[in-house]
Amino acid sequence: LSCAVAIDMATATGRAEWQARAALLTPIAKAHGTDIGCEVSHLGVQIHGGMGFIEETGAAQFSRDARITPIYEGTNGIQAMDLVGRKMQDNGDAAFRLIDEVQRSTEGARATLPDLAGDVWQASEALREATEAMVALPLNDRFAGAVPYLRAFARVLGADAHLKAALAD
């Protein structure tokens, strides 16, 4: 959702910070969403046991349908390389701004949900350190850690979304 909001705001306002955020979030949303879709569909086959491979359950078709999604619009590996390459040409400024935002929301949650807020803070600090390390590397060296970096970023953003949802409850 935050990716869609960033895209809409970038389109509506033309502001550089929204454009940078939309650009940063797009490969994360695409790759993480499709990776999770594959995992969930494979679990669907698994929970059906041997019947998961039988067409009548529908699980095998879901699995086949999901499997192509990490390939559409650039494979997820390419999306990750885009994240650490083109999307970090600003020395990680857009990434650091987003991490700062996560940490501000985490700070606001410490009184109400100290354990969860502490975990999200710790994860966001690890992401900050990974981002600092990533932007310090030459471009070609960044690619080796691109996929794990994208996954870490997605998990921190997901944790932040869950923290905000828990606060709204």
Language-model features, listed with the residues they occupy:
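Flavin-dependent oxidoreductase catalytic core characteristic
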Residues: L1-D169
